[in-house]
């Protein structure tokens, strides 16, 4: 067997290699490093020095013994060490020549197997993702992250180190890593959710397209402004429009409703209901402008307002005197009074109605009630009250109640009344 020699590096270099940041792994970093370590089998003695120098330049670490006994070597700046073999016989280096080739072959075969399995599973994952979702391109970056080529060198280095000592564990770890895209896909949203998510916008568009008949707030605002301008230009009042709608379409609207529509003060639902009616009225009014139509006649009737009645001071004084005598005259009294004052019966009736409303506004109700109570005699308030003993004979409340106020039922009385009612219902 060819001899293996080692060069003795300076003590400072050994300190840097062992304690100052050297590698602390007990195996080569990768399969490529394992192949480079073949320099240890020298067939010519004149290559020993160069091979030993190259050995110290490799990133691979010394043997496990060097890792465990680094602190016990006591290497310092003044120590004169000969060689590694002189200080510590390394069984790892002695047996390296015997098992190096089988280990390299196992590493190569395991690496090929792992790469084949990972590529096969990655291809299956991409096919499944492409069949499951129309947006498989969105998942490609996630799947590619677990591809063999996308892994970091450090992960590959740890995988190779594990294969040297535990090939079965390394294959299982690689298999688990290759299956990771499937778990990532399961953790994500399902294809149905993706399809529903991306089709949601289309569904909303379809729904909104089916509800095109419902106007928006902007449409209502624009129509209200246009309607008001056209109505004023045509010469119709808001009361005319409300009366015309009632005559034409059967829905009578007041002047206040039309005013609130133009001012956008109605609810959105009522605005939507009123808009088509006003639009039809506006179209008919535009088409029949200049010719006397039913709308014009209705508008003319609406514009016919009665002239405000003016009553002379003497007549008003007579009505006031009669009002103090009788605030609510009968029909015969109204007729006789109208004849005596030479007024229409309807004018007299309306005047009395307005006068009564004015009296209510001028007189607070509490004052009127207080005056009435003050005017009553003291005994009248008590004897004019409610006497329950007149109509409570035979009742559970007793027959000798002398209270002049409505009886207040206590819980005991309510319970007894309920028991009596239950007994009567049972019989």
UniProtKB/Swiss-Prot annotation:
Predominant localisation class: nucleus
Recite the UniProt keywords alphabetically: Activator, DNA-binding, Homeobox, Nucleus, Transcription, Transcription regulation
Residues annotated as coiled-coil are none
Record-linked Gene3D superfamilies? Homeodomain-like (1.10.10.60), lambda repressor-like DNA-binding domains (1.10.260.40)
- In what ranges is there compositional bias, type Low complexity? 49-66
Q: Which cysteines are joined by disulfide bonds?
A: none
- Biased composition, class Gly residues, residue ranges: 67-77
Instruction: Respond yes or no to whether keyword Cell wall biogenesis/degradation is given for this record.
Output: no
- GO annotation (BP), single: positive regulation of transcription by RNA polymerase II
The chain positions of domain POU-specific read 212-286
DNA-binding region residues: the ranges are 304-363
Matching entries from PROSITE patterns are given as: HOMEOBOX_1, HOMEOBOX_2, POU_1, POU_2, POU_3
Q: Which domain of life is it from?
A: Eukaryota
Q: In which tissues is it expressed?
A: Coexpressed with acj6 in overlapping subsets of neurons in the embryonic epidermis and central nervous system. First detected in the precursor of the tracheal pits and the stomodeal invagination and later in the peripheral nervous system.
| InterPro entries from the UniProt entry | HD (IPR001356), Homeobox_CS (IPR017970), Homeodomain-like_sf (IPR009057), Lambda_DNA-bd_dom_sf (IPR010982), POU (IPR013847), POU_dom (IPR000327), POU_domain_TF (IPR050255), TF_POU_3 (IPR016362)
Cellular-component GO terms for this entry: nucleus
User: What is this protein's function per UniProt?
Assistant: Binds to a DNA sequence element required for the expression of the dopa decarboxylase gene (Ddc) in specific dopaminergic neurons. Could also play an early role in specific ectodermal cells, and a subsequent role in the embryonic nervous system.
Family from the record: Belongs to the POU transcription factor family. Class-3 subfamily.
Kindly provide the name given to this protein in its UniProt entry.
POU domain protein CF1A
The organism encoding this protein is Drosophila melanogaster (Fruit fly)
Gene giving rise to this polypeptide: vvl
